[in-house]
Amino acid sequence: MGFKLNSLFLLLSLLILTILSGADQALAYVKKPHVSQRNKTALAAVAGRGGGKEMLKGRKQTSGCNLFQGRWVFDASYPFYDSSTCPFIDGEFDCLKFGRPDKQFLKYSWQPDSCTVPRFDGEAFLKKWRGKRVMFVGDSLSLNMWESLACMIHSSVPNTKTTFLKRTPLSSLTFQEYDVTLFLYRTPYLVDISKESVGRVLNLGAIEDGADAWKNMDLLVFNSWHWWTHTGVQSQGWDFIRDGSSLMRDMDRLDAFNKGLTTWGQWVDQNVNVSQTRVFFQGISPTHYMGREWNEPRKTCNGQMQPLTGSTYPGGSLPAASIVSRVLSTMRTPVYLLDITTLSQLRKDAHPSTYGGDGGTDCSHWCLPGLPDTWNQLLYAALSM
């Protein structure tokens, strides 16, 4: 009797384990994300060379280190270069050339709370990316970052021969000895603006114009946001918005940005080969026109000489940054978010202000040398870790 009971108990245990195992497999099958066959093959190739895990976690942190949580500290070793010796800076970013009297804003480095950022080495960057193509795609903040990286590399290898072509929409800088080319593709909305019978139409569902130029790069750094806030047909560059079959004069700009960025995400998923190309999103660069955000009502970036202390911005987060995070989370392609928003919000002192050469007050872009050098240092760290 005892033998029969023990046998029955053993059979019941095996049956329960079989059922649970089958349920686990079914659940795993249901939760498995959809990945195209091409990207399955590409991801397998990346994993095979030890990079898959790093790329797949790229939306969050790098090697357990949050590069973007920290504070600004005074650093006498900064800046990385002298603007007067860099031939690639546009006047609108060359604040010292146009008379900015203070230089303390150049002497701050970003210190993450949980790790140390490796110092940028332009020659090491060129050697690692020898024969490669790097492209920044976006608006004038992409221009800001592109020129910064060009100057940072140039300061490390000042005697190397370069080929510099600046055109619209595609510019390039090639470091000939290393066969490394930095491209800039200017497209403020990422999605298309087309000429139709009614006028210029911002098409939230289309990326066709020029997007072939983005393909087959080794590193892509995308950016978009500032132009989505522009109003008035001259400033915004379009007359109508097309959303599916609807054609309208205007719509909620955050909603439009969300739809346009979703279209961009779909383009990346369909066209980027992750075994060849690493993809970054530059993150949302803030402005400093409203001093109430940092408890100085009626102030702007004009006359600001020091960054905010601490690691949080009094004005809080930006809704556009949440949209970027949401869109990236829905994509199959691993896109690393270069989450520069908060650390840039703390730098109310780093804008051209009245020293951009055009007579206005610019609290949108950034002086060079300056904050975009830190963006590139963090890009360098993310690529190195």
Swiss-Prot record:
Record's keyword annotation contains Membrane: yes
Keyword presence, Transmembrane: yes
Main location: membrane
Motif (GDS motif): 138-140
Short motif (DCXHWCLPGXXDXWN motif): ranges: 362-376
Keyword terms: Membrane, Signal-anchor, Transmembrane, Transmembrane helix
Molecular function in Gene Ontology: O-acetyltransferase activity; sequence-specific DNA binding
TM region positions: 7-29
Annotated membrane topology: Single-pass type II membrane protein
GO terms, biological process: jasmonic acid mediated signaling pathway; plant-type cell wall modification
Any Gene Ontology CC annotation: Golgi apparatus
Localization (cell): Membrane
Other facts: Contains 2 motifs that are conserved in esterases, but it is unlikely that this protein belongs to the catalytically active pectin esterases.
Family classification: Belongs to the PC-esterase family. TBL subfamily.
Function according to Swiss-Prot or TrEMBL: May act as a bridging protein that binds pectin and other cell wall polysaccharides. Probably involved in maintaining esterification of pectins. May be involved in the specific O-acetylation of cell wall polymers.
Name of this protein: Protein trichome birefringence-like 37
Native source species: Arabidopsis thaliana (Mouse-ear cress)
